[in-house]
Amino acid sequence: MGFWILAILTILMYSTAAKFSKQSWGLENEALIVRCPRQGKPSYTVDWYYSQTNKSIPTQERNRVFASGQLLKFLPAAVADSGIYTCIVRSPTFNRTGYANVTIYKKQSDCNVPDYLMYSTVSGSEKNSKIYCPTIDLYNWTAPLEWFKNCQALQGSRYRAHKSFLVIDNVMTEDAGDYTCKFIHNENGANYSVTATRSFTVKDEQGFSLFPVIGAPAQNEIKEVEIGKNANLTCSACFGKGTQFLAAVLWQLNGTKITDFGEPRIQQEEGQNQSFSNGLACLDMVLRIADVKEEDLLLQYDCLALNLHGLRRHTVRLSRKNPIDHHSIYCIIAVCSVFLMLINVLVIILKMFWIEATLLWRDIAKPYKTRNDGKLYDAYVVYPRNYKSSTDGASRVEHFVHQILPDVLENKCGYTLCIYGRDMLPGEDVVTAVETNIRKSRRHIFILTPQITHNKEFAYEQEVALHCALIQNDAKVILIEMEALSELDMLQAEALQDSLQHLMKVQGTIKWREDHIANKRSLNSKFWKHVRYQMPVPSKIPRKASSLTPLAAQKQ
């Protein structure tokens, strides 16, 4: 009797000790934090002792091994730290004792992690594949949390690392293996690495069956068919996950099996087609109706799905599909085609006669426009002086600038030009006057000839005018080419300023050819249309037009 009592007491003592004892392990040179198996309020005092020597564990954080309340910290751990540690939770009314069995192992030279270093195995499936990092909640760590499988870093969009766990999308059997999490523990500014490994297994979700769910057709669906054409009806139903037994789909006509209905035109396919929808096993059955007739519209078509849970029925009826009015469609297409053709023709015509249309619109809508932009002139003419004189003693360029240009633009169109030599006051500083007049002009007309590359006055006016147009965006430039620069000297155009060359390439030039213009002062010529198009809207009535009124009065 005494022997049995002793045995029972021994078992109770062992089970009690085991209940309040915890196994912990780690690797050398890594951080290890152990929690006391006996829990208590945060205000309770917890004393730690090394059981073999009954020596108290210090609480000073400068020590490599120190106690911090319910936690025992090894920063870092050493193999010699292995042993049993005692923690005593002290309260005003009781004391509770717990034991922590700590084992520190040497780091493995190879990639294999022995079983005694593995944490509990977790399993996952296609819908649940979380792998938690063991004991991470005990540490003061920050992201990132690194994950490895069989010592290989995980890569790919299938692996998603969350705060303390790993999620694997579309889990497969090949995903089973040993997964290691690695993070950094921070203690008073010092960093210590921590690793933990656990196995992950993939399990197949158990199959299940459910009451049939018909995906198609919808209940009381009306399907439109064309008389004389073939029609197909599909009955599709799902029965659960995994292999399904005693599941079937079929069609009935007016409550009768297809084979018993006796209409050879209406037949269902031999066998059932298996498919999967959202992981569920489904069966499909197609009913084929050849040469649809009027009497087929009066029949009731039933899609039946049945298994061990029961029978579900969806009813379908046929209706005549309104014939397509091809004549109306052809008319609509024809009208749209004609409309698009007209638009294209109008666009082409407008593009061809855009300048004429713009000038006509100016004459009709706003023939004259007063501006308060601080400008005095509509255009400043930049041209080379001292040009080679013709046989009659007058320069062709100066004749064009001083005679033809003012006669057309000022007398016939109502513009105000500023021309060097004509609009300069006697005794006025030339440089100041040129710069002021250029800035007070809305357009800058450049007369381009081979002479411009050797003319200093032209170079200065060109620089000021281009600065206003390109840098200050205060005016626009009109380029008139009196002689093709490439005809006399291929290097002439290359000698121009880069900005002027850029304008010539971007907007082009208006070419004046005396030999090609019959009436040099006709507003209907192509040359003057392009010049007027690039000029602003006139601000006053042309001189010749305004002089007609007093002349007419005198005749009366």
Swiss-Prot record:
There is a cross-link at K321 (Glycyl lysine isopeptide (Lys-Gly) (interchain with G-Cter in ubiquitin)). It catalyses: NAD(+) + H2O = ADP-D-ribose + nicotinamide + H(+). The keyword Glycoprotein applies. Highly expressed in kidney, lung, placenta, stomach, skeletal muscle, colon and small intestine. Isoform A is prevalently expressed in the lung, testis, placenta, stomach and colon. Isoform B is more abundant in the brain, kidney and the liver. Isoform C is not detected in brain, heart, liver, kidney and skeletal muscle. Expressed on T-cells in fibrotic liver; at protein level. Overexpressed in fibrotic and cirrhotic liver. One of its GO terms (molecular function) is interleukin-1 receptor activity. InterPro entries: Ig-like_dom (IPR007110), Ig-like_dom_sf (IPR036179), Ig-like_fold (IPR013783), Ig_I-set (IPR013098), Ig_sub (IPR003599), Ig_sub2 (IPR003598), IL-1_rcpt_fam (IPR015621), IL-1_rcpt_I/II-typ (IPR004074). Its EC number is 3.2.2.6. SUPFAM superfamilies: Immunoglobulin, Toll/Interleukin receptor TIR domain. The TIR domain mediates NAD(+) hydrolase (NADase) activity. Self-association of TIR domains is required for NADase activity. This is Interleukin-1 receptor-like 1. It comes from Homo sapiens. The lineage of its organism: Eukaryota, Metazoa, Chordata, Craniata, Vertebrata. The gene is IL1RL1.
